[in-house]
Every structure is written in structure tokens, then in C-alpha cells.
């Protein structure tokens, strides 16, 4: 019998833990955040979250559901009926393709939708090729389900560009899926319709799945929605689309998203839902239903706020000597920029925090290609962005 774990002998507390869990780590801005609390008066632009409180029409719908006694399990593991119907209509209208109820499953957050997509496909010994720079949760989630995370970086020459031939060459016989975020967190890079068509054709030829993270799809500035794989894929294609209410409807704390999948795997997705989380809270789903049915003005307001923030950021940062500003992104909620001569932005972020009281996310979080970059969330009230940029200008000039 192995020795019992104890405070005096904690090593044995880790016996038997799965390697993927034992080795799991999260990259964060924790040290900067701790310092920010010590400094006070810090404008936090490092998180991927706006400052808008969820509007009353969504909150009231959730409250009404609670008041009506909606405190029980939702028996359909794919979601609350009115929300399923609303999502089917919404996606069909938005993408110009029939996307029926059978193709959508509601999840407690976009991260859960992503995790279910990976659990559906990834075995130990297989890999997922993902487009980088990328939100660090993606790398860790692939690792957590037992797969090999295989980053493939966008090229940067003043603009972020995807080398499709290189991406396809990075795949091999063990590749289960290609993962991309479009618009991207952190770069704002957005796949074109032509790139989506090439990805879909590659999937049809090879059997490799496409997982498209479209959480920022409505935060696109050239059209009501960014180019989507759902606009061209058939129900029988090996395509999964991850989405969330967090960004476009100001609902980050509600933890609700959805996965769009082929009808043929609906049974497996429903079973996974039952075993992993037993469904999403009914009152939260009621709020999300209101967001879908009544929320277009809200989406447009958030989009305008981001465009204003980006315009302000680019106008101010261009005045700071040595700033490297990529082509202004067409989507997302971030300005992603670098400082000439700085190979690692962590020192720059710490310096800006100390001297300007502005919190930015260092690029190393998003992969080695992004080490020199800083991420600024611009989905904030105009005055807050102006104050932050004013402090940075005063510091750097």
C-alpha cells in the first residue's frame, strides 16, 4: 500500500493523477494584476471583456424565468426549446443556410462548447493544428483532452496573413482537426470566404475536421457577420462551430454558448452534455433567448464601441515613437501592437503599468510569434480609453 498523502509528505498527493492534469498550467497576468491592486487607479485593459453591464431586457427575461419557477433541469440536453428555436432561426438568417434545431447544442459557456468539440474528436496520440497567435486556453484544452497541440503561426509583415499551403502541410495522418479563431483573439485577423472554401475543400479531401471559433464573428466591421464556415458547409461536412453570448451581447459572466455541429453527431453531443454538465441553467437560457430575439441593437452598439476604441487607440499609438501598428483589424475587440527593439513585451507591460497605470496583456500569452506584442481591449467606454491612451502618451513622449 502506498504511503498516505499528508501535509508533511505532499509528494504522494500527486500519485495517480493523469499526466495531462499533473502537467497542466495556465499562463496569466496574475503577477501584473497583483501589482495593479497594490498601485490602485489602474485602468484594466488586459482582459477580453467589455465594461458594459448586461442590459435590462436580458436580465429581466432571466428573472422572469426564475419567478415562474424555472429552477429545474432542462430535460433536453441540447437546450431550452425556445432558445434552440431562436438559435436555429438566427443562424439560418445570418448565414443564409438552413441550420435546423438538430445542429445546435447549448453549452455553459463557449469554452465548454470548445471542450466538447475536442472531446468528440481527439484521442491520445492524435493532434490538432491550430492557427496562432491564439488564446492560451486553446493550447491547454487540446493538451487536456490528450492531444498534441500543434501551433501554426500567421505570417506578419505589417499585416497578419495565413499561409494555407503551410497550414495544410503541418497536418499529418494523426491530425484530427484544424482549429482557427476568426476574427482572432488577439490579432483580429479574419479568414476570408476564399480561405474558408479552401479549408472546407481540404477537410472534404482528407477527412480532417474544421473547428471554427466564431465567438467574435458579430464584432466584425465590414458586414453584419464575419465570413463563416457555416455559410458554405453542408450538414454532412466535418465542421464544428464554437460560439458564445459573452462578447457580442455583454454576457461574459452568464457562462452560456453553443456548438453548431452535424446532425449526425447530435446524439453523441447530447450524451456528452448529460455526462459533462447535465445542461445549462434554464434561467440563463431564458436570458440568452431574449438576447437573440431582441439583441440586434445591442450587438450594433457594442460593435460601434469597439470601432471607436480602435480608432482612438490607433490615433494615439501612432504618435508614440517606436510603436509597431499592424493594419487595423477588421474584427475582434483588441488593438495588438509592438514596440520596436523589444523582443519580450512583459517588461513593456510592467513599465506601462508602473508609470501609466494602464494594464495591458503581454503577447507571450498567445504564443512565441507574439512575444513582442501587447494586447489592449478597446471594448470600453470612450472616456476610459481616452484616459488610458493619454497616460501612455504622457509616459512615452
Spans of features found by a protein language model:
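Helix C-cap/helix->beta junction micro-motif
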Residues: 39, 145, 205-206, 356
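Active-site phosphate-binding strand-loop segment of PLP-dependent enzymes
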Residues: 150, 154-222
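Conserved core segment of the aminotransferase class I/II
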Residues: 2-7, 232, 237-307, 314-316, ...
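A short helix->loop->beta-strand "cap" motif at the edges of active sites that frequently abuts
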Residues: 126, 147, 205-208, 237
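Conserved glycine-rich beta-strand-loop-beta hairpin in the small C-terminal domain of fold type I
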Residues: 289, 305-314, 325-338
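N-terminal small-domain helix-loop-helix segment of the aminotransferase-like
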Residues: 2-13, 18-109, 116, 292-294, ...
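Conserved PLP-anchoring active-site segment centered on the Schiff-base-forming lysine
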Residues: 103, 120-142
